[in-house]
């Protein structure tokens, strides 16, 4: 029964005996609250009490909860005062009956992720997509020795073809065109709403260990050199990535875009061209990209260029051999066709991404959900614009710039209105090719098909599809991209547990509106997004007094969140998480205003809807995991998010409407009105 009531209790997390025990414990613990609720219902029995408790607002100075019927009653811990710990109040009943395995977690976002993984597993196991079916039929364990020999031949070619640095740069470009991370990927990426051929960093590069590499490179010294060199470049990429989040002055940290334009019309982003004779320049030329059309490049390419120049020919050959093994060893070692397909799909920038994106959009998400969420996004935009206009601290010039950026912001919902038909990779019909060879051929098409189909495009649909190649719409995520000033709401958000057409407006405005759409919109105005203007140029949105006040408020947010503790005593890094926390608070405010714009009726009805909205906001961030999970997930240099309970408690107590809705006049987390942080 509880598994039906609590949608996010994982099937393998709790036994029947535990369910019985926790059920008895839960109802015994909440017996007094149940009696109070029954008394309240009896007292109001002469009324239509299907909605708010119209007489339940506590008197000033009286700290007690409003006990009423709620869409979310199954999650609420009525014994916890909403002014003491709202996250516990809104999700405590669920927390009490949910048991997770050591080091694991469950919750709303975890459920979204589980559904995404379930979809991928299903399509890979069933082979219902034509391209997948062809690979299914071609797979045979008898091809193992043939496949190993093919890989060994590739390593032999690297050994024979690379005798100096210039040949190494050419071989890098050749392997990139074949879909290898050597040590960057070659594809397409949009910068300021124009798609360029691109050198793309790959966060998954460098994970193959020396034992596997040693299967294909028998010489121990050569194997060690290959692994060491590859790990160095992988670490370099990670260091560049971490540097994006490093503080640059008081609370100036934020999401930095990782691509710039080399050559072509740079629009002031970066000086055109590269030093003559530099490795990156030679790779650039070997890829066949002209200076006139330009190339989008990973912002850390200069650091790669420096390391290229310091590397010996032996090290460069080792790097190239490692690149081949790093990608292909898992394909060759797959036990069956499903495992092979999952390895391909899980790879970063995989060639089947657009096929999967389209299939997911057409089979998993009702079209009407996209229309409803699109409408919701425009309501949030309208509410945000009103808040900008009424901002008490922005100057007239600052308001005009902010509203212009918001108005020009693209909001991608789910999938494009039309797909680029010339961007479909095709699986070869050659019956002599093994499944591994078919996959390698698909990777070659990533450059030969995607680059000509997308380069130079400037329209919404092509920009969106370009982003979908590395940010697939079936993943559990949503992003804001500053150099294109666009929000991308993945299609996985258009179904439960995020957008749920069977639930109330309060739920959908909170979970889809606040934690997703409003959150991503506000990223355009956080400590990172505010460094970019309406057209994606790296030019501060605010100046003078506006910028000074904004950074002061960001500093207040950093200090406030730095007071929270998690995972057995770890303090939240308020500076590292400030951009996400600003986005959370902005989304919470904007979606609330959007909801209130839809709610008519009496003041009591509006207060009831407000309470339901804030309760749903907590459900959107609902999560349970032990200290091991919390430490592993949040105590890392690249995770810029605070733990979910902090994202709730750190923000709701900043909002005046929250206090009004629940009649809160005190409590452990109460913040005096004059001390509440008001940004967006």
Language-model features: locations:
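N-terminal module-boundary/linker segments of secreted carbohydrate-active enzymes
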Residues: 59-91
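Short secondary-structure subsegments characteristic of cysteine-rich extracellular domains
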Residues: 101-127, 221, 239, 244-252, ...
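Bacterial Sec-dependent N-terminal signal peptides
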Residues: 38-64
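Bacterial N-terminal signal peptides that target proteins for export
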Residues: 5, 9, 16-32
């Amino acid at each position: 029964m509880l598994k039906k009531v609590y949608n996010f209790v994982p099937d393998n997390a709790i036994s029947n005996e535990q369910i019985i025990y926790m059920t008895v414990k839960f109802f015994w613990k909440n017996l007094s609250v149940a009696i109070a609720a029954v008394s309240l219902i009896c007292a109001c029995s002469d009324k239509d009490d299907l909605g708010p408790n119209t007489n339940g607002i506590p008197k000033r100075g009286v700290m007690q909860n409003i006990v009423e019927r709620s869409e979310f009653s199954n999650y609420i811990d009525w014994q916890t005062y909403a002014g003491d710990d709202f996250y516990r109040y809104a999700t405590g009943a669920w927390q009490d009956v949910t048991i997770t395995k050591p080091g694991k977690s469950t919750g709303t976002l975890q459920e979204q992720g589980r559904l995404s993984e379930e979809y991928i597993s299903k399509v890979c196991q069933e082979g219902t997509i034509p391209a997948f079916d062809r690979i299914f039929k071609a797979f045979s364990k008898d091809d193992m020795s043939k496949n190993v020999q093919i890989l060994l031949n590739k390593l032999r070619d690297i050994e024979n073809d690379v005798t100096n640095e210039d040949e190494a740069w050419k071989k890098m470009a050749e392997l990139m065109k074949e879909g290898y991370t050597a040590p960057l990927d070659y594809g397409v990426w949009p910068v300021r709403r124009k798609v360029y051929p691109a050198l793309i960093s790959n966060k998954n590069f460098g994970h193959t260990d020396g034992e596997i590499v040693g299967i294909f490179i028998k010489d121990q010294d050569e194997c060690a050199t290959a692994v060491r060199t590859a790990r160095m470049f992988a670490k370099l990429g990670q260091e560049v990535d971490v540097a994006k989040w490093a503080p640059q002055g008081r609370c100036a940290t934020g999401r930095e875009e990782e691509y710039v334009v080399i050559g072509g019309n740079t629009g002031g982003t970066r000086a055109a061209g590269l030093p003559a004779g530099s490795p990156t320049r030679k790779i650039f030329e070997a890829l066949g990209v002209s200076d006139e059309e330009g190339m989008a490049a990973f912002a850390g390419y200069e650091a790669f260029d420096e390391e290229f120049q310091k590397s010996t020919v032996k090290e460069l050959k080792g790097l190239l051999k490692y690149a081949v093994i790093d990608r292909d060893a898992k394909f060759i070692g797959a036990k069956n066709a499903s495992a092979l397909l999952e390895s391909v799909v899980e790879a970063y920038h995989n060639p089947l991404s657009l096929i999967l994106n389209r299939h997911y959009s057409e089979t998993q998400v009702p079209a009407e959900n996209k229309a409803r969420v699109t409408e919701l996004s425009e309501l949030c935009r309208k509410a945000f614009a009103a808040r900008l206009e009424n901002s008490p601290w922005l100057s007239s010039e600052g308001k005009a710039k902010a509203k212009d950026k918001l108005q020009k912001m693209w909001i991608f919902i789910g999938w494009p209105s039309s797909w680029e038909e010339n961007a479909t990779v095709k699986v070869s019909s050659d019956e002599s090719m093994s499944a591994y060879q078919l996959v390698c051929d698909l990777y070659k098409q990533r450059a030969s098909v995607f680059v000509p189909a997308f380069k130079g495009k400037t329209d919404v649909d092509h920009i969106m599809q370009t982003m979908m190649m590395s940010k697939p719409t079936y993943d559990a995520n949503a992003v804001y991209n500053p150099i294109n000033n666009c929000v991308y709401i993945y299609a996985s958000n258009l179904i439960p547990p995020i957008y749920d057409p069977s639930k109330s407006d309060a739920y959908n405005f909170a979970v889809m509106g606040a934690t997703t759409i409003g959150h991503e919109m506000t990223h355009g105005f956080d400590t990172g997004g505010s460094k970019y203007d309406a057209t994606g140029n790296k030019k501060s949105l605010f100046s003078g007094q506006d910028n000074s006040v904004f950074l002061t408020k960001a500093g207040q947010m950093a200090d406030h969140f730095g007071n929270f503790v998690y995972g057995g005593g770890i303090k939240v890094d308020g500076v590292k998480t400030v951009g996400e926390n600003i986005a959370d608070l902005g989304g919470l405010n904007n979606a609330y205003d959007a909801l209130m714009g839809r709610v008519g009726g009496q003041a009591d009805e509006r207060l009831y809807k407000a309470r339901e909205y804030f309760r749903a906001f907590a459900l959107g961030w609902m999560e349970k995991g032990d200290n091991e999970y919390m430490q592993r997930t949040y105590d890392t240099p690249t995770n810029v998010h605070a733990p979910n309970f902090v994202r709730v408690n750190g923000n709701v107590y900043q909002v005046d409407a929250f206090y009004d809705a629940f009649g809160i006049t005190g409590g452990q987390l109460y913040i005096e009105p004059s001390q509440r942080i008001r940004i967006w």
